[in-house]
Design a protein with these regions (language model features):
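Beta-strand signatures of extracellular beta-sandwich domains
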Residues: 91-95
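A short, structured loop/turn motif at beta-sheet edges
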Residues: 64-68, 97-100, 127-130
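Short amphipathic, basic-aromatic surface patches that mediate peripheral association
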Residues: 75-83
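Helix-rich interaction surfaces within compact, conserved domain-sized segments
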Residues: 101-165, 172-174
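Short coil-to-beta strand junction motifs in C2/discoidin
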Residues: 83-90
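Transition segment at domain starts
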Residues: 26-67
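Bacterial N-terminal signal peptides that target proteins for export
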Residues: 1-11
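Sec/Tat signal peptide C-region and signal peptidase I cleavage site
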Residues: 20-26
Length: 174
């Protein structure tokens, strides 16, 4: 009896994992990346970064082929304060053309929690072609007041050399 229940549980788990993988593949992702905090004096797509460094404990951005953009940040903070300071809302912008490119779409603002957590899920109009895509997380509200348009970027898609990675199988690294 216990063996039958165990076998069924394993089979159900495998089936659910397969369904998840197939649904993720069906999503048609055009772009997925981690998100890192900004440093001052950096311009991407004509948008300046904030005046102080920001950090992100965990963040990701994904854009699928029907224009659905999903951005999630956890602990997006000003390290000197340990919180997001006066920033209470954020939006996301898609830049095409790399750091020298242009902003082609920006989402509506969403709340940024006092812990620096936010989730953006929005449909954006995609251009026919987008080389070197970058997603910017931008300050969009201060002290509860929304800006008329998105402000400086405080995080963006990318990686840092200190990002955790598993290089057990990477024989070229030493």
């Amino acid at each position: 009896m216990i063996t039958t229940v165990f076998v069924r549980a394993v089979l159900l788990g495998g089936l659910l994992a397969g369904v998840f993988v197939l649904s993720a593949m069906a999503e048609g992702f055009l772009f997925r990346s981690t998100i890192v905090g900004s440093n001052p004096n950096t311009v991407i797509g004509g948008v300046p970064s904030g005046g102080a460094p920001w950090t992100v404990q965990r963040g990701s951005a994904a854009l699928n082929d029907d224009g659905r953009l999903r951005v999630e940040v956890r602990d997006l903070i000003l390290p000197k304060l340990g919180n997001p300071g006066p920033v209470t809302n954020v939006s996301a912008s898609l830049v095409c053309g790399g750091s020298g490119g242009t902003v082609v779409a920006t989402t509506d603002p969403v709340p940024l929690s006092a812990d620096g957590n936010a989730e953006i899920e929005a449909g954006i109009k995609l251009p026919d072609t987008c080389f070197g895509p970058i997603v910017l997380v931008r300050a969009a509200g201060f002290n509860g007041n929304l800006l008329p348009q998105a402000g400086p970027w405080i995080a963006a898609t990318g990686f840092t050399s200190s990002s955790e990675h598993d290089d057990k199988d990477d024989k070229d690294r030493k």
